[in-house]
UniProtKB/Swiss-Prot annotation:
The keyword Metal-binding does not apply. Keywords: Cytoplasm, Hydrolase, Lipid degradation, Lipid metabolism, Membrane, Nucleus, Transferase, Transmembrane, Transmembrane helix. GO terms for molecular function: N-acyltransferase activity; O-acyltransferase activity; phospholipase A1 activity; phospholipase A2 activity; phospholipase activity. Residues 20-135 form the LRAT domain. This is Phospholipase A and acyltransferase 1. GO terms for cellular component: cytoplasm; cytosol; endoplasmic reticulum; lysosome; membrane; mitochondrion; nuclear envelope lumen; nucleus. Exhibits both phospholipase A1/2 and acyltransferase activities. Shows phospholipase A1 (PLA1) and A2 (PLA2) activity, catalyzing the calcium-independent release of fatty acids from the sn-1 or sn-2 position of glycerophospholipids. Shows O-acyltransferase activity, catalyzing the transfer of a fatty acyl group from glycerophospholipid to the hydroxyl group of lysophospholipid. Residues 1-138 are cytoplasmic. It catalyses: a 1,2-diacyl-sn-glycero-3-phosphocholine + H2O = a 1-acyl-sn-glycero-3-phosphocholine + a fatty acid + H(+); a 1,2-diacyl-sn-glycero-3-phosphocholine + H2O = a 2-acyl-sn-glycero-3-phosphocholine + a fatty acid + H(+); 1,2-dihexadecanoyl-sn-glycero-3-phosphocholine + H2O = 2-hexadecanoyl-sn-glycero-3-phosphocholine + hexadecanoate + H(+); 1,2-dihexadecanoyl-sn-glycero-3-phosphocholine + H2O = 1-hexadecanoyl-sn-glycero-3-phosphocholine + hexadecanoate + H(+). It comes from Rattus norvegicus. One of its GO terms (biological process) is ether lipid metabolic process.
Length: 167
C-alpha cells in the first residue's frame, strides 16, 4: 500500500495477528505489531504519557517499555496501515512464534536508540527474527550527507576563519 492508501480507524482494514502496523505521526512513523482482538505490542517511553503522544517523546528517550495496548489507543487521531514491507526480503516467522515472542516481551524495559534500536527494529525483530528499520537507515544517510557537506565546506575554506587567527 502506498502512503495514499492509509486508512483511519473509521474505515480500518482488518489486520491479522503478526501484521506490522505503521502509524503516521507528524514527521515520522511509529510501528506496532498486531496481536489480535484489537491489541498491538509496541514500545513506548518508560514514563506514563498517553500512547498517541508517547512516540514523539520516545525519539529522545534511551529506555522504553514494551506494552500491549489497544490499536485505537496507540493510533489516537493519526492514521495507520498494515505494512508487512519486508516480507519479500525476510520470511515471516510462524504467527504462533511471533505471538509467543511478543507475549514474552510485554512489560520488559528495553534500550531505545533512534538509529539502531527503535520501534521499527523492535517489531521487525518479532515478525522476522531480524531488527530492520528503513526509517533509521534514511536518518543515518541524512546524517552522513550533512557531515560530508560540512567536511567539503571546511576543506574548500568556505567557512570563515576565526577572528584574530594569524595567517
Amino acid at each position: 500500500m502506498a502512503v495514499n492508501d492509509c486508512f483511519s480507524l473509521t474505515y480500518p482494514h482488518n489486520p491479522h495477528p503478526g501484521d506490522l502496523i505503521e502509524v503516521f505521526r507528524p514527521c515520522y512513523q511509529h510501528w506496532a505489531l498486531y496481536l489480535g482482538d484489537g491489541y498491538v505490542i509496541n514500545i513506548a517511553p518508560v514514563d506514563g504519557i498517553p500512547s498517541s503522544f508517547s512516540s514523539a517523546k520516545s525519539v529522545f528517550s534511551t529506555k522504553a517499555l514494551v506494552k500491549m495496548q489497544l490499536l485505537k489507543d496507540v493510533v489516537g487521531n493519526d492514521t495507520y496501515r498494515i505494512n508487512n514491507k519486508y516480507d519479500t526480503t525476510y520470511p515471516p516467522l510462524p504467527v504462533e512464534e511471533v505471538i509467543q515472542r511478543s507475549e514474552f516481551a510485554i512489560g520488559q524495559e528495553v534500550t531505545y536508540d533512534l538509529l539502531v534500536n527503535n520501534c521499527e527494529h523492535f517489531v521487525t525483530l518479532l515478525r522476522y527474527g531480524e531488527g530492520v528499520s528503513e526509517q533509521a537507515n534514511r536518518a543515518i544517510g541524512t546524517i552522513g550527507l550533512v557531515a560530508a557537506g560540512i567536511d567539503i565546506f571546511t576543506f574548500l575554506g568556505l567557512f570563515p576563519k576565526r577572528q584574530g587567527a594569524k595567517s
